[in-house]
């Protein structure tokens, strides 16, 4: 069974026009927040010799690196990552004993 007539109506066809965008898409600031948190925790880990701060800085820096876009400033992200790695290395060079959780000092 073959239809020879086209069931569509040519006079009812309209070309699609996307609606005009009045607002810019919201920026995701997770990368910036994690970058700042990573730097703060890195400095706390370096200055106060807190290993858990240094490890939290590595965690925040890797989240910042994972969520970064190609257009983001890579120098800032890499420097934050290197600062957090150096905080971990320096905290373990000063005291090579395993890390104790922060709440362990509250019970003694």
Curated annotation (Swiss-Prot):
GO terms for molecular function: protein folding chaperone. Residues 1-27 are annotated as: Disordered. The keyword Zinc-finger does not apply. It is a single-pass membrane protein. Residues 1-16 have a biased composition (Basic and acidic residues). GO terms for biological process: protein insertion into ER membrane. Keywords: Membrane, Transmembrane, Transmembrane helix. The chain crosses the membrane at residues 77-93. Pfam families: ASTER. GO terms for cellular component: endoplasmic reticulum membrane. It is found in: Membrane. Belongs to the Asterix family. This is Protein Asterix. It comes from Manduca sexta (Tobacco hawkmoth). The lineage of its organism: Eukaryota, Metazoa, Ecdysozoa, Arthropoda, Hexapoda.
